[in-house]
């Protein structure tokens, strides 16, 4: 099951949990109000899972691939890890399904504070277009994830600041409406 919390301000190893002391947990409902969607699926049977098939059809996720992030599997590993951890947004939703291993997605809340979302095998997350976020491995240094897209994949990340993009403006409008 996914777990999320507000992060401390430490610049130490990005793979560490970085929990506040005492911990400030973040609920699935709080994530939902940020536009973040979570599902728990059967990663052992992802190739034949009827629930995954239903989700892909309902959400029009017509394209997918599988990426393994590990120093022995990913070309330009160190460079990629640094790139993933740069704060950025996308113009489309980012959908990731963890098939093995674990890692962290960090997202900004409405007050611009970091929330760390711990992802492990079986977790699927959808980050809305326009949300500032980043990704890092945890201390296990390994994740295998399915990347899902509506139509052809668009890989472009826009590093912060990117507030003038329509996707960011739409996301900020969503947050304002959620606050009412």
From Swiss-Prot:
It is found in: Cytoplasm; Nucleus; Cell membrane. Catalyzes 2 different reactions between oxygen and the acireductone 1,2-dihydroxy-3-keto-5-methylthiopentene (DHK-MTPene) depending upon the metal bound in the active site. Fe-containing acireductone dioxygenase (Fe-ARD) produces formate and 2-keto-4-methylthiobutyrate (KMTB), the alpha-ketoacid precursor of methionine in the methionine recycle pathway. Ni-containing acireductone dioxygenase (Ni-ARD) produces methylthiopropionate, carbon monoxide and formate, and does not lie on the methionine recycle pathway. Ni(2+) binds at residues 88, 90, 94, 133. Pathway: Amino-acid biosynthesis; L-methionine biosynthesis via salvage pathway; L-methionine from S-methyl-5-thio-alpha-D-ribose 1-phosphate: step 5/6. Fe(2+) binds at residues 88, 90, 94, 133. This is Acireductone dioxygenase. Monomer. Interacts with MMP14. Keywords: Amino-acid biosynthesis, Cell membrane, Cytoplasm, Dioxygenase, Iron, Membrane, Metal-binding, Methionine biosynthesis, Nickel, Nucleus, Oxidoreductase. The keyword Chloroplast does not apply. Its EC number is 1.13.11.54, 1.13.11.53. One of its GO terms (molecular function) is iron ion binding. GO terms for biological process: L-methionine salvage from methylthioadenosine; methionine metabolic process. It catalyses: 1,2-dihydroxy-5-(methylsulfanyl)pent-1-en-3-one + O2 = 4-methylsulfanyl-2-oxobutanoate + formate + 2 H(+); 1,2-dihydroxy-5-(methylsulfanyl)pent-1-en-3-one + O2 = 3-(methylsulfanyl)propanoate + CO + formate + 2 H(+). Pfam families: ARD (PF03079). Its cofactor is Fe(2+); Ni(2+). The gene is ADI1. GO terms for cellular component: cytoplasm; nucleus; plasma membrane. Belongs to the acireductone dioxygenase (ARD) family. It is a peripheral membrane protein. Binds either 1 Fe or Ni cation per monomer. Iron-binding promotes an acireductone dioxygenase reaction producing 2-keto-4-methylthiobutyrate, while nickel-binding promotes an acireductone dioxygenase reaction producing 3-(methylsulfanyl)propanoate.
